[in-house]
Swiss-Prot record:
Involved pathway(s): Carbohydrate metabolism; pentose and glucuronate interconversion
Protein name per the record: Uronate isomerase
Class of enzymatic activity (EC top level): isomerase
InterPro entries, per the entry: Metal_Hydrolase (IPR032466), Uronate_isomerase (IPR003766)
SUPFAM superfamilies: Metallo-dependent hydrolases
UniProt-listed Enzyme Commission number(s): 5.3.1.12
UniProtKB keywords: Isomerase
Gene symbol of the encoding locus: uxaC
A family per Pfam: UxaC
GO molecular function: glucuronate isomerase activity
Domain of life: Bacteria
């Protein structure tokens, strides 16, 4: 019987173990998409205790706590202490067997805290609390200290077009920080004209860009100014959260002006008008990214804020989102083609939340590859509900069967936690075990030089090359 979480966790044969320990584990982390706070990195935040760094803002854990029947006051309540929330988590973890949270929890205790051979639960919680808090009191366990321990080379944060990016500039000017922190352009509030807050948001964009927006070309001018600002601060990637993927042929500016005018006047838009405006903005933005050498990321298929009562109480991003089931293939094809037809499709990474769409994306990327850029259009790593063992394996296998796994840009945390870098370790172990199993079964050559190069490329090298502006 195998022992739980040894050094060879998830590595089932000697080939896999060699690939992981010798080649994957030493590679730096290129975390090109996350939701870390740039201010916390700039300020090198120090955490008061394990409960704070572990549970603050982690909606994966919050969902598990709710599923275990824990009172909301012990999850997000302002009236309860970090220790009380921590103990609620300690009582919940033994109930998470089979959920990736059980693996992640113990991986996060191993690295960076060095706690091994101990199962986390109510019986061990006090000892672990003391050990971890002692380490969190040292400089090596500040926000940047943890990133350095985990060998993080680069992170891409998620930033609104109206953001000042003051903390990115502060980080870039600080010679003591050897981790690159690049902003990523997230313009969801610009192209989602149907949202209640769209008009108010345009007012904020006007102020940030110093452009009055009454026509569609005004919007282009405002966005261009903000794109220039992001570029000056080191941005080289965009990200778009798309719940419903719409497409309609882009109308002329007169029609777009009319659509924007109706929305600014408080009138209700038709589905066609929403699709026309959304497509026009996304296609125009995509062409701007291509001209700048940026990467375009599309995260497709979440249903957000399902629980109205809890949304009113807590707001967004608090654990009440799930997988959508809209059809995406036709609209996605037309959207990408609208940029490619003029040879202005940027480097693009596609992510789906519904795993039934894996093969859709794995085959879609082959339609729009381009010369001179290996893996120009990528099928992104298992996202959100899919960044667990089964979801990662499905994505890796389907990409390998329908595309080129060797060109894959690999894993990202997509996380708000400084302890989530162990997800890169989790991914690397799964990747090495998959390749090791294929080699052991005679499906691919047992060639250490060939396999090690592929592992190192997927773990770091491909992403570093892909996100470099040439």
């Amino acid at each position: 019987m195998a022992t739980f979480m040894t050094e060879d966790f998830l590595l089932k044969n000697d080939i896999a173990r060699t690939l992981y320990h010798k080649y994957a584990a030493p590679m730096p982390i290129y975390d090109f998409h996350c939701h870390l706070s740039p201010q916390e990195i700039a300020d090198d935040r120090r955490f008061d205790n394990l409960g704070q760094i572990w549970l603050e803002g982690d909606h994966y854990k919050w969902r598990a706590l709710r599923s275990a029947g824990v009172d909301e006051s012990l999850i997000t309540g302002k009236e309860t202490s970090d220790y009380e929330k921590y103990m609620a988590w300690a009582n919940t973890v033994p109930k998470t067997l089979g959920n990736p949270l059980y693996h992640w929890t113990h991986l996060e205790l191993r690295r960076p805290f060095g706690i091994t051979g101990t199962l986390f639960g109510p019986d061990t919680a006090e000892s672990i609390w003391t050990q971890c808090n002692e380490k969190l009191a040292t400089p090596a366990f500040s926000a940047r200290g943890i990133m350095q321990q985990m060998n993080v080379r680069m992170v891409g944060t998620t930033d609104d077009p109206i953001d000042s990016l003051e903390y990115h500039r502060q980080i870039a000017a600080d010679d003591s920080i050897d981790i690159e922190v690049a902003p990523s352009w997230r313009p969801d509030k610009v192209f989602k004209i149907e949202l209640d807050g769209f008009v108010d948001y345009l007012g904020k964009l006007e102020a940030a860009a110093d452009v009055s927006i009454t026509r569609f070309d005004d919007l282009r001018q405002a966005l261009t100014r903000r794109l220039d600002h992001f570029a000056a601060c080191g941005c080289r990637a965009s990200d778009h959260g798309i719940e419903t993927l719409r497409f309609a042929p882009v109308p002329d500016d007169a029609q777009l002006d009319a659509i924007l005018g109706k929305r600014l006047a408080g009138e209700t838009l038709s589905e066609l008008e929403i699709a026309q405006f959304t497509t026009a903005v996304l296609v125009w933005l995509g062409r701007q990214y291509a001209a700048r050498g940026w990467v375009m990321q599309l995260h497709i298929g979440a249903i957000r804020n399902n629980n109205t009562r809890m949304f009113r109480l807590l707001g967004p991003d608090t654990g009440f989102d799930s997988i959508g089931d809209n059809n995406i293939s036709w609209a996605l094809s037309r959207l990408l083609d609208s940029m490619d037809v003029t040879n202005e499709l940027p480097k693009t990474i596609l992510y789906c939340l519904n795993p039934r769409d894996n093969e859709v994306l794995a085959t879609m990327i082959g339609n729009f590859q381009g010369p001179g850029i290996a893996g120009k259009v990528q099928f992104g790593s298992g996202w959100w509900f899919n960044d667990q063992k089964d979801g990662m394996l499905r994505q890796l296998e389907q990409l390998s069967q329908m595309g080129l796994l060797s060109q894959f840009v690999g894993m990202l945390t997509d996380s708000r936690s400084f302890l989530s870098y162990t997800r890169h370790e989790y991914f690397r172990r799964i990747l090495c075990n998959l390749l090791g199993q294929w080699a052991q079964d005679g499906e691919i050559p047992d060639d250490e030089a060939m396999l090690s190069r592929m592992v190192q490329d997927i773990c770091f090298n491909n992403a570093q090359r892909y996100f470099t502006i040439k």
